[in-house]
Amino acid sequence: MTDTQNRVAMGYIKGVFGIKGWLKIAANTEYSDSLLDYPEWHLVKDGKTISVTLEAGKVVNGELQVKFEGINDRDLAFSLRGYTIEIPREAFAPTEEDEYYWTDLVGMTVVNKDHTVLGKVSNLMETGANDVLMIDGEHGQILIPFVSQYIETVDTGSKTITADWGLDY
């Protein structure tokens, strides 16, 4: 797996703040300030990748703002607008047993107890009560709550999820 394939998009740079190189971030994480846990970021746009080091960060009125080493003025900061923020997957904190990062579930094949392939996980959605797998396959889109009542096993090695779910549900 190449370095690029092993990185996860975590948000993007949506604008600048002030004149000293601060940037506004749109985070694709549950808690926007969790991006501050990663000192090294990869910024990607139009096939170009820039590696940057986080100098400082803060949440102001619910908005994540960051400062990178070497980015000290508004013009240079503005040139980074629109870049996607990627973090190496191996930098993520380990999960507890039966806990998974969404990025690890996307792309997994979902089969039911009859070994019928339901499709692949294309995305997940948060409903408040629980997360829901969005599965795309030859049977159309299937939504399965990601709870133990329906999910029997998650095998990260074989990238397979076994669900107690019929085609007629």
Swiss-Prot record:
Q: Which domain of life is it from?
A: Bacteria
Any one Pfam family match given in the protein's UniProt record, by short name: PRC_RimM
Compartment annotation: Cytoplasm
Instruction: Tell me the InterPro entries matching this sequence.
Output: PRC_barrel-like_sf (IPR011033), PRC_RimM (IPR056792), RimM (IPR011961), RimM_N (IPR002676), RimM_N_sf (IPR036976), Transl_B-barrel_sf (IPR009000)
Gene3D superfamilies linked to this entry: PRC-barrel domain, RimM
Q: Which GO terms describe its biological process?
A: maturation of SSU-rRNA
Q: Which residues cross the membrane?
A: none
Question: What's in the GO CC field?
Answer: cytosol; ribosome
Q: Which UniProt keywords apply?
A: Chaperone, Cytoplasm, Ribosome biogenesis, rRNA processing
| One Gene Ontology molecular-function label | ribosome binding
Q: Where is the PRC barrel domain?
A: 97-169
The record's comment about this protein's domains reads: The PRC barrel domain binds ribosomal protein uS19.
The entry's function note states: An accessory protein needed during the final step in the assembly of 30S ribosomal subunit, possibly for assembly of the head region. Essential for efficient processing of 16S rRNA. May be needed both before and after RbfA during the maturation of 16S rRNA. It has affinity for free ribosomal 30S subunits but not for 70S ribosomes.
- Can you state the subunit structure given in the record? Binds ribosomal protein uS19.
Stated family:
Belongs to the RimM family.
Protein name per its UniProtKB record? Ribosome maturation factor RimM
